[in-house]
Amino acid sequence: MLAILNSTFAYFQQLPWLELVAMLLSLAYVILAARGSLWCWPAAFISTALYTYIFYDVLLLMDSALNGYYLLMAIYGYWQWSKRTDNKQQNSDDLTIVSWNVTWHVKACLILTVVAFCLGYLMANFTPADFPYLDTFTTVFAVFATYLVTQKVLENWLYWIVIDLASIYLYIEKDLIPTTVLFVVFVVVASYGYHKWLKLYQKSSIKLQTSALTNP
């Protein structure tokens, strides 16, 4: 038992602390976003700044660029949510969730797939990037999914579940163990986020229907 504890302690001592800080802040962002808290965006801003450097250092260039984009979207997301959230409350009850139809998402996915293939080809042939196609696919779809979060679109969580599952393989291959663990947790939190937002969406839909009946 003592040997196991010593081995575990030694393992955590060797972990890259910059990655651990980024991991914890990213986890805070996802949990806060799932709960509808405006404070998710400051956590996102700091974590993405750290991950921009971390991914560049291991030649996951598209992931590095993606986190640079996240950095900007953290500012935009905070601004968008603050317009539609009571700053005194800042909780999930203040969220106004929307849902976009399946046809719209199918068209978006087809366009994003074409874009990802084109960018993947460029990354494979003109950069030293590892896993250029998978890295590009997760990046392109994550860009889109992040925009959906800022617009409070219910289906964003379904995109994140798929993106996070693909990312788990990518980070295992690059030996980014803390980040791999983080993305396993992300899959769970994204599932929770979808069900949480679905309830809020259904609740707001009932309110709108009731309002329409009482105010013809």
Positions of PLM-derived features:
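C-terminal transmembrane-bundle signature of multipass membrane proteins
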Residues: 156-161, 166, 171-174, 178-209
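Membrane-water interface of transmembrane alpha-helices
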Residues: 69-88, 198
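Short, strongly hydrophobic alpha-helical membrane anchors
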Residues: 1-17
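Membrane-proximal helix-loop-helix units in multi-pass membrane proteins
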Residues: 81-141
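Membrane-helix interface "capping/anchor" motifs
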Residues: 31-42, 147-159
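Membrane-interface helix caps and helix-loop-helix hairpins in membrane proteins
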Residues: 56-63, 122-130, 149-153, 172-177
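Hydrophobic, membrane-inserted alpha-helices
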Residues: 22-29, 46-52, 140-145, 161-169
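Early transmembrane hairpin module of multi-pass membrane proteins
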Residues: 24-29, 37-77
